[in-house]
Swiss-Prot record:
It comes from the Bacteria. Belongs to the aldolase class II family. RhaD subfamily. The keyword ATP-binding does not apply. Its EC number is 4.1.2.19. One of its GO terms (molecular function) is rhamnulose-1-phosphate aldolase activity. The active site is at 117. This is Rhamnulose-1-phosphate aldolase. CDD domains: Aldolase_II. It comes from Salmonella typhimurium (strain LT2 / SGSC1412 / ATCC 700720). Catalyzes the reversible cleavage of L-rhamnulose-1-phosphate to dihydroxyacetone phosphate (DHAP) and L-lactaldehyde. Its cofactor is Zn(2+). It is found in: Cytoplasm.
Length: 275
């Protein structure tokens, strides 16, 4: 009998959460991660499912996600412990046929529940499904140190944050040409911050929560982790630049345009036109 803990998706979640912990992005129970699956992914492991799956209603219906399975991190769970006990810290859930709630098919033992940021995740999944024609499958939230730091010293608007991150490392414009969305500070774990994040996810694969963290979206766990990692590396460079007295020179507008042409991407116009 196949064991679900050996599946590609459980093993992938173990690696992503462990890597994020080692990066210092997910202290204590900080951060959350969800991966949209297909029925074919989970079907071979039905023997591992709970005999009586618990049902939890969503705070608002999400018919676009009807009958869709996900693997999710649990509420109050530490990323550093996922590798030690996947079944206690992860869960496979499946949205019901009308999108009104979900059953916990596997994991989240001892009456654990999915991440408190599930509204933000599911709403963002809906928007990224539409924006990428179903290509994006992952939503990752973490407390990337240097990205958080920048929200204290830079004006919190999309064009400026995006432009500075592009300048912090040449690869950034190629990796996230759609720029970085940013919210005002909001109380986490609410439908309101979930809706605001999803609205930004219509246009951007990265969304900053000032003084808190970042949301990233991508087609795979590796791509999503790499997206955040790239932005965080640029933020680290910027933090060092500002601590050394600021930029003396940087990548110019003309060079950014040339970079976009070379790699066949269309940079966010407002960031290009900023100065």
């Amino acid at each position: 009998m196949q064991n679900i803990t050996d599946s590609w998706f459980v093993q992938g979640m173990i690696k992503a959460t462990s890597d994020a912990w080692l990066k210092g992005w997910d202290e204590r129970n900080g951060g959350n991660l969800t991966l949209r699956l297909d029925e074919a992914d989970i079907a071979p492991f039905a023997a591992n499912f709970h005999e009586k799956p618990r049902y939890i209603a969503l705070s608002q219906p999400m018919p676009l996600l009807a009958n869709t399975p996900f693997i999710v991190t649990g509420s109050g769970k530490f990323f550093r412990n996922v590798q030690l006990d996947p079944a206690a810290n992860l869960g496979v859930v499946k949205i019901d046929s009308d999108g009104a709630g979900y059953h916990i098919l596997w994991g989240l033992t001892h009456d654990a529940v999915p991440t408190s940021e599930l509204p933000a995740h599911f709403l963002s999944h809906c928007e990224r499904i539409k924006a990428t024609h179903g290509k994006d499958r992952v939503i990752m939230h973490c407390h990337a140190t240097n990205l958080i730091a920048l929200t204290y010293v830079l004006e919190n608007n999309t064009a400026l944050i995006t432009r500075k991150l592009w300048e912090g490392s040449t690869e950034c414009l190629v990796v996230f040409p759609d720029g970085v969305g940013i919210l005002p500070w909001m109380v986490p774990g609410t439908d309101e911050i979930g809706q605001a994040t999803a609205q930004e996810m219509q246009k951007h694969s990265l969304v900053l929560w000032p003084f808190h963290g970042v949301f990233g979206s991508g087609p795979t766990l590796d791509e999503t982790f790499g997206l955040i990692d790239t932005a965080e590396k640029s933020a680290e460079v910027l933090v060092k630049i500002y601590s050394m007295g600021g930029m003396k020179q940087t990548i110019t507008r003309e060079e950014l345009v040339a970079l976009g042409k070379r790699f066949g991407v269309t940079p966010l116009a407002s960031a290009v036109a900023l100065y």
